[in-house]
Amino acid sequence: SLKDLGYLVKLDTNGYMPDVLKRAVESGAVDYVAMDIKTSLDEYPKLCGVENIDTSRIKESIDFLLSGVVDYEFRTTVVEPLHHKENFEKIGEITKGCLRYYLQSFVDSGNIIGKNCFPPTQEQLQNYLEILSYYIKNVSIRDRG
């Protein structure tokens, strides 16, 4: 395995399969988890286009990581006009006290389904960062350029 060769293993996840996440972490197979939080839990059906999405699974993964069993980060890719300040107030509430949180700007690859998606302004990102900073000490903007 990679771990036997001395490599550290990072798992990127959307958090929708908390049982798989827990098994991977508790088995020692994973050293670091990066979890995407797409939006506030109440907005997931709209953003993901899945009316009956079970957001309790995402919350379970968030709570598991908050328990501190593994090093982790949460992150949100900010897409305008899909995100607004209320999203980040609600995200801050459910991730309060997390180790680190990154905001990253949407980058249009040219291969997206919706044509009305665009990157936020630096001012918008800064405003969202300030909202999250009320709940989280280590929050920053990650440059994806």
For each of these PLM feature ranges, what is it?
Residues 1-122:
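Conserved AdoMet/S-adenosylmethionine-binding subsite of the radical SAM
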Residues 126-145:
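A C-terminal junction/extension of Radical SAM enzymes
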